[in-house]
From Swiss-Prot:
Bias type Low complexity, positions: 373-409
Bilayer-spanning residue ranges: 542-562
Protein name: Leucine-rich repeat transmembrane protein FLRT2
Post-translational modification as stated in the protein's UniProt record: N-glycosylated.
Keyword S-adenosyl-L-methionine: no
Compartment annotation: Cell membrane; Endoplasmic reticulum membrane; Cell junction, Focal adhesion; Secreted, Extracellular space, Extracellular matrix
Glycosylation sites: 202, 298, 433, 521
Chain ranges of the LRRCT domain: 310-362
Higher taxonomy: Eukaryota, Metazoa, Chordata, Craniata, Vertebrata
LRR repeats: 64-85, 89-109, 110-131, 134-155, 160-181, 182-202, 205-225, 231-252, 253-274, 277-298
Subunit structure: Self-associates (via leucine-rich repeats), giving rise to homooligomers. Interacts with FGFR1. Interacts with FGFR2. Interacts (via extracellular domain) with ADGRL1/LPHN1. Interacts (via extracellular domain) with ADGRL3 (via olfactomedin-like domain). Interacts (via extracellular domain) with UNC5D (via the first Ig-like domain). Can also interact (via extracellular domain) with UNC5B, but with much lower affinity. Interacts (via extracellular domain) with FN1.
Tissues expressing this chain: Expressed in pancreas, skeletal muscle, brain, and heart.
Gene it is expressed from: FLRT2
BP terms from Gene Ontology: axon guidance; basement membrane organization; cell adhesion involved in heart morphogenesis; fibroblast growth factor receptor signaling pathway; heart morphogenesis; positive regulation of synapse assembly; regulation of neuron migration
Keyword terms, alphabetized: Cell adhesion, Cell junction, Cell membrane, Developmental protein, Disulfide bond, Endoplasmic reticulum, Extracellular matrix, Glycoprotein, Leucine-rich repeat, Membrane, Microsome, Repeat, Secreted, Signal, Synapse, Synaptosome, Transmembrane, Transmembrane helix
């Protein structure tokens, strides 16, 4: 008999292999849980040791952990054990909010992201960064790092560093010797006043540079400092003390340039000439009054330009900006060009200005401002032409004034006489009603805007509260409403013309008196101006009082009718209800002092006493007493009592009565 052998089934081997894999996985998970420090909490690849008042990093950080949270503790520089450096799986460490005063040693060797902000780090050594060859992102914000506290070439030891954040420290200059592969550098909110030409010499990969909130001036920036940043895409130098944009800005890849909150008062023509890829430019909150013509010509890819809060002076030098704003493509968004001077155009948008009306020098050749007047022109100005529909309406013409005609030098050097303002503007007044006046004017030259003022005059012609209205140059009339009847107003028209504007000489005034109120046509004329004014001011209240009085009168009448009707109805009901008669005063007088319930009162004129159920009448005396009512009933002659009125008038009845 031969030996029989059985072959292990293939599915059994597969089952054994799967069971071994699952067992090893469970063992690894259990080992990790058992290896988690007792003061921490472990969750998969994360170890949470934050906010536990630790003074050192706990021992026993297991291998396989990728993120280590140690922030908001009291860890100092002596609290980093040497074995922590050998944990190779950790790539992110959070250590912000601790008590470090130096850059820590013995950090995990393969860490890539390190958060050290909100400590008190003052010094950074080369040896500390030399341990972190794979460090890519370093956050050192909110520390006490100074320029002398950074060892020369310290950051260069971190050869893989891409992002370096040094915001809110005590740096007085940009550290020299930064890693060549650095892509983003933030040194904002420091005390940097100087940037040497060696600071960015080898940073050919830098794409984002933020130097906001420092003490930089144009003298503190070395020539050619930024020319080496060939890959720079965003440059922000906000809140410094620059008087003009930094020169030699790299234009190969620059897309965003922020220059706001400086002291920039002029921009050279070539400042942006190389920035052909620039898409966003911000020059807000500076001291710019004008711009050199053509300064934006090479910004072919510009998408947004912000120029808010600059003292733009809208004279001849800003004409090209107005023209440029009218023809920019729709893809370009421009904001902030608002005139701050001269006074007559303050608050107007530069885009809406009429280029022919901007304040230009009077000596501009080939551009005569006005038609020359003959040399024999009279020096006396003529009053404005006024068209008044009704001659009976009160109107006081302006008093002619004498002034010397201004002369403007012509382009060939000869002087020409400028016509007076009254000859170039005609003013007319139309009375609409007793409280409204329509003022119209006609100008012989183009005016950018007008200012119309009016004031009510008193007995002494001393002006009161002046009201004014600014209207555009295209408008030729304005209605003055809510005026007081029978009042004199002084109306002045000021052309806000940018050509040699003179507030006194270029003002034309006139006086007009409104009609009396139509409500006073049938009454006597007011004795004084104050009475007319008082009546005019009280007319709305008078009308309201009349309406209110009429309503009250109607309500009183209706209430009186209702009360009378109810009283009449109640009296009729009381007469009809016989049991109420005894309650009247007359009945009580005739019946006695008070009604007695033992007295059977009969109201009929005749009656008969009969027995009930054939029973005998009760023996006793019955006394019949007639009651004589004043409104009728039994006559006193029906009884033998001759004088029953005495019974009513006395409190004791008579001795004689009728008996049965």
């Amino acid at each position: 008999m031969g030996l029989q052998t059985t072959k292990w089934p293939s599915h059994g081997a597969f089952f054994l292999k799967s069971w071994l894999i699952i067992s090893l996985g469970l063992y690894s998970q259990v080992s990790k849980l058992l290896a988690c420090p007792s003061v921490c909490r472990c969750d998969r690849n994360f170890v949470y040791c934050n906010e536990r008042s630790l003074t050192s990093v706990p021992l026993g950080i297991p291998e396989g952990v990728t993120v280590l949270y140690l922030h908001n503790n009291q860890i100092n520089n002596a609290g980093f054990p040497a074995e922590l450096h050998n944990v190779q799986s950790v790539h992110t460490v959070y250590l912000y909010g601790n008590q470090l005063d130096e850059f820590p040693m013995n950090l995990p060797k393969n860490v890539r992201v390190l958060h050290l902000q909100e400590n008190n780090i003052q010094t950074i050594s080369r040896a500390a960064l030399a341990q972190l060859l794979k460090l890519e992102e370093l956050h050192l914000d909110d520390n006490s790092i100074s320029t002398v506290g950074v060892e020369d070439g310290a950051f260069r030891e971190a050869i893989s560093l891409k992002l370096l954040f040094l915001s809110k420290n005590h740096l007085s200059s940009v550290p020299v010797g930064l890693p060549v592969d650095l892509q983003e550098l933030r040194v904002d909110e420091n005390r940097i006043a100087v940037i040497s030409d060696m600071a960015f010499q080898n940073l050919t990969s830098l794409e984002r540079l933020i130097v906001d909130g420092n003490l930089l001036t144009n003298k503190g920036i070395a020539e050619g400092t930024f020319s080496h940043l060939t890959k720079l895409k965003e440059f922000s130098i906000v809140r410094n003390s620059l008087s003009h944009p930094p020169p030699d800005l790299p234009g190969t890849h620059l897309i965003r340039l922020y220059l706001q909150d400086n002291q920039i008062n002029h921009i050279p023509l070539t400042a942006f000439s190389n920035l052909r890829k620039l898409e966003r430019l911000d020059i807000s909150n500076n001291q710019l009054r004008m711009l050199t013509q053509g300064v934006f010509d090479n910004l072919s890819n510009l998408k947004q330009l912000t120029a808010r809060n600059n003292p733009w002076f809208c004279d001849c030098s800003i004409k090209w900006v107005t023209e440029w704003l009218k023809y920019i493509p729709s893809s370009l968004n421009v904001r902030g060009f608002m005139c701050q001077g001269p006074e007559q155009v303050r608050g107007m948008a530069v885009r809406e200005l009429n280029m022919n009306l901007l304040s230009c020098p009077t000596t501009t050749p080939g551009l005569p401002l006005f038609t020359p007047a003959p040399s024999t022109a009279s020096p006396t100005t003529q009053p404005p032409t006024l068209s008044i529909p009704n001659p009976s309406r009160s109107y006081t013409p302006p008093t002619p004034t004498t002034s010397k005609l201004p002369t403007i030098p012509d382009w060939d050097g000869r002087e020409r006489v400028t016509p007076p303002i009254s000859e170039r503007i005609q003013l007319s007044i139309h009375f609409v009603n007793d409280t409204s006046i329509q003022v119209s004017w006609l100008s012989l030259f183009t005016v950018m805007a007008y200012k119309l003022t009016w004031v009510k005059m008193g007995h002494s012609l001393v002006g009161g509260i002046v009201q004014e209205r600014i209207v555009s140059g295209e408008k030729q009339h304005l209605s003055l409403v809510n005026l007081e009847p029978r009042s004199t107003y002084r109306i002045c028209l000021v052309p806000l013309d940018a050509f040699n504007y003179r507030a006194v000489e270029d003002t034309i005034c006139s006086e007009a008196t409104t009609h009396a109120s139509y409500l006073n046509n049938g009454s006597n004329t007011a004795s004084s101006h104050e009475q007319t004014t008082s009546h005019s001011m009280g007319s709305p209240f008078l009308l309201a009082g009349l309406i209110g009085g009429a309503v009250i009168f109607v309500l009183v009448v209706l209430l009186s009718v209702f009360c009378w009707h109810m009283h009449k109805k109640g009296r009729y009901t009381s007469q009809k209800w016989k049991y109420n008669r005894g309650r009247r005063k007359d009945d009580y007088c005739e019946a006695g002092t008070k009604k007695d319930n033992s007295i059977l009162e009969m109201t009929e004129t005749s009656f008969q006493i009969v027995s009930l159920n054939n029973d005998q009448l009760l023996k006793g005396d019955f006394r019949l007493q007639p009651i004589y009512t004043p409104n009728g009933g039994i006559n006193y002659t029906d009884c033998h009592i001759p004088n029953n009125m005495r019974y009513c008038n006395s409190s004791v009845p008579d001795l004689e009565h009728c008996h049965t």
